[in-house]
Amino acid sequence: MRALLTSGALSMAFTLFLTPVFIRLFRRLQWGQFIRDDGPQSHHAKRGTATMGGIVVILGTLFGYFVALLLTGDETSVSALLVLFLMVGLGTVGFVDDFLKTRRERSLGLTGWAKVAGQVLVATVWALLVIMFPNGRGATPATMSVSFIRDLPGLDFANITRFGAIGVMVGYGLYLIWINFIVAAASNGVNVTDGLDGLASGASILAIGAYIIIGFWQSIQSCASSTLNPENLSKCYDVRDPFDLAVVATAIVGAVVGFLWWNTSPAQIFPGDTGSLALGGAVAALAILSHTELLLVLIGGLFAIEAGSVIVQRAYFKLTHGRRIFLMSPIHHHFELKGWAEVTVVARFWIVGGLLVAAGVGTFYLEWLAT
């Protein structure tokens, strides 16, 4: 419990007090935001605002997590390190994208395919790592099964690998596709949500905060726990290192809370792709390692709505040869163009995101009660 509280406090203090230092540094380096010409006119005033704030969030998370372990004497776990690996890996892809934008002085960095290639590379390496490193019980950080609140026995890709060489290729291939899909959906969902001051940061606090609750509860009801009530043995969670997942989630939330102080309207710094891809990677990693992959539809529901609005807009535009459903996508820009103030859009989207997170956590708990 000490590590849980300490990691969040330290990471929040880091970003809260040091973000102004990074803002001045980024301005000196001319790492400023460039704005789409076809975007809302009110956004043009944001041109030149410091970007790549994800660097601060990542550093704050690492500082809070590792210093907390040092102070409490606790040891890290493979699962927690894997969350940080995906977060930093995707953050690096985002940094390259942001850096190219600042060098080229335009709002486009990496090409779409180059960004996808970077995400696929990081996600594929990560997907292979999470089914390695078994502990004394033989449990790996993740499994090859699709999960909702627990692994779904009928959707275990490992079963396919038993059918010879072709089965191995198909089983691992489907597993890698599934993990890449989750990582891409989460990271790009947060990425497209990052279009208004504080929107993606606040939504990420809510979503990742859910995994603090989930990880803590899973640790109490863990099948490996020596204090587990025998009456609950039939509904215990077979999750590797759940408390450590809660600790690293707390460090991330603390870092984003401190960062949000400077990112809220009028923002003095933006997360950039560095931050949005990193936070999306953290969400994906926590969902996969806590065996709650399909529950992410609720916990990350706001990100799904934002990403879905982009997909629907583009598909409808092509099918109707130029017509649009929304005035502009992602959908938060639609409401801006409808006349909503930016802070109103952000506040209402936070409410929607919070309700979806509450529904996700509630579903998680109800499943335990019903088991």
Swiss-Prot record:
Function in brief: Catalyzes the initial step of the lipid cycle reactions in the biosynthesis of the cell wall peptidoglycan: transfers peptidoglycan precursor phospho-MurNAc-pentapeptide from UDP-MurNAc-pentapeptide onto the lipid carrier undecaprenyl phosphate, yielding undecaprenyl-pyrophosphoryl-MurNAc-pentapeptide, known as lipid I.
**Top EC class for this record:** transferase
- Entry keywords, A to Z: Cell cycle, Cell division, Cell membrane, Cell shape, Cell wall biogenesis/degradation, Magnesium, Membrane, Metal-binding, Peptidoglycan synthesis, Transferase, Transmembrane, Transmembrane helix
Compartments it resides in: Cell membrane
**Which family does the similarity line name?**
Belongs to the glycosyltransferase 4 family. MraY subfamily.
User: What's this protein's name?
Assistant: Phospho-N-acetylmuramoyl-pentapeptide-transferase
Q: Which cofactor does it need?
A: Mg(2+)
Q: What's the encoding gene here? A: mraY
GO BP terms, alphabetized: cell division; cell wall organization; peptidoglycan biosynthetic process; regulation of cell shape
Enzyme Commission number(s) of this protein: 2.7.8.13
- Identify the species of origin: Leifsonia xyli subsp. xyli (strain CTCB07)
> What InterPro entries has UniProt attached to this entry?
Glycosyl_transferase_4, PNAcMuramoyl-5peptid_Trfase, PNAcMuramoyl-5peptid_Trfase_CS
An example of a GO molecular function for this protein is: phospho-N-acetylmuramoyl-pentapeptide-transferase activity
